[in-house]
Amino acid sequence: MRLLPFLFILYITNYLDRTSLAYAAIGMSRDVGFSDRVLGLGSGIFFISYVALQIPGALLVERWSARRMISATMIAWGSLTALTALVHTPSQLYLARFVLGAAEAGFFPGVIVYLSHWFIKEDRAKATSNFMAAIPLSFVLGSPIAGWILGHKWFAVEGWRWLFVLEGMPAIVLGAVAFFVLTDWPREAAWLAPKQRQWITQKLEEEKPGGPQAITVGQILRSRTVVLLGATAFLDYFAAYVMIFWLPTILKRQSGLSDMRVGLLGAIPYVVAFIAMLINGWHSDRNGERRWHSAVPVFIAAISLLGLIRLPGSTPLTVVLLSTACVITAFLPAFWAIPTEVLSESAAAATVGMVNAVGSVAGFAGPYAFGYLHARTGSFSYGFAMIAVFALAAGFLVLLTPGVRERAPAKPLAP
């Protein structure tokens, strides 16, 4: 109860900071003349440094200190988000976003590895789902918060500048608090009873895959497990990021409702995704099964996306299908439990970084490809078909990954 609620709050803060540009873009285009191309490149350039530093960030948590790493990254990204309020030129925006990506790179893979330091395998997917449920909830909360801030102009300063400042400062404060709240290992937790520390440490030691711990990048890239996980993450993230960035526009075009009503309707799919993620993570732990709990939400989303192709224009039906499509995010808890269970500690840390890096590339590619198809065809149907195929492929690939019972205990990487 001490760690998960706090990590949950940290991840909400992370996503609010990461997506602040999406809400600030309207004001930036008006006040400093940034074109859609500039804003699009500014958004995408974030992922260049973010992807490049995924593996080093994850390994720092394993080999240095999760507490120090998480604290430092939060203070850094909070400061950089706040400083983005000072941009006046495209080059300043590009620099701010590039450095922000570098600052955030180690947080997510670091937390996934950190959870494996604390939670035994039968609790790991539930812990991951409780942490990652912050993603849909951040979108539920972020839109009204950003809208309220953008509507104000305190001390003659534009609302979009205040948005960066006010969403960056909580990360700085929470980063400092994290240094004192988090503990690297159960054996170091003075707030646990001695018997609790001993029990958790012993259970985690018993679950460790055996064999050598040192690994190389070459071993990672040659591992069938890592290749499958990376391909699955790319395909799933491709579809998921399309839903994240295009959902408001899809609702607006399909319904013709006001922006305010679209904003309220847009929260419904993320509420559904939030509930689905918690239930799927809980059920995965209860049954000790990961692959099907990763695949089924993706298959459900694919069916919903195919339904959107034949959509007759009904707003309620649109919301229902988009809600079930957003269930694709329920794939995450069981999926991220796989590398921490079938690989050794150092292999899992490097793999989480590598897989998340590959998946994050889709954060730029997915929304861009979907927008390109819409611009060329004038219809969302081709984009829905594309991401439905990607989602189906992700579901089938994750079923090919080795299960916990299939791992080779003498090897740091599954073959």
Name these PLM-found stretches.
Residues 21-22, 218-278, 332, 336:
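Extracytoplasmic gate region of multi-pass secondary transporters
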Residues 290-338:
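C-terminal transmembrane helical hairpin of 12-TM major facilitator-type secondary transporters
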Residues 96-133:
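Cytoplasmic helix-loop-helix junction between adjacent transmembrane helices
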Residues 63-74, 285-298:
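Cytoplasmic membrane-interface "Motif A"-like loop-to-helix N-cap segments
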Residues 126-147, 170-171, 356-366:
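Glycine-rich segments within core transmembrane alpha-helices of 12-TM secondary carriers
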Residues 52-91:
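Conserved MFS/SLC helix-loop-helix module at the cytosolic interface between two early adjacent transmembrane helices
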Residues 33, 65, 86-92, 103, ...:
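Helix-breaking motifs and short loop linkers at transmembrane-helix boundaries and internal kinks
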Residues 2-36, 142, 243-248:
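Extracytoplasmic
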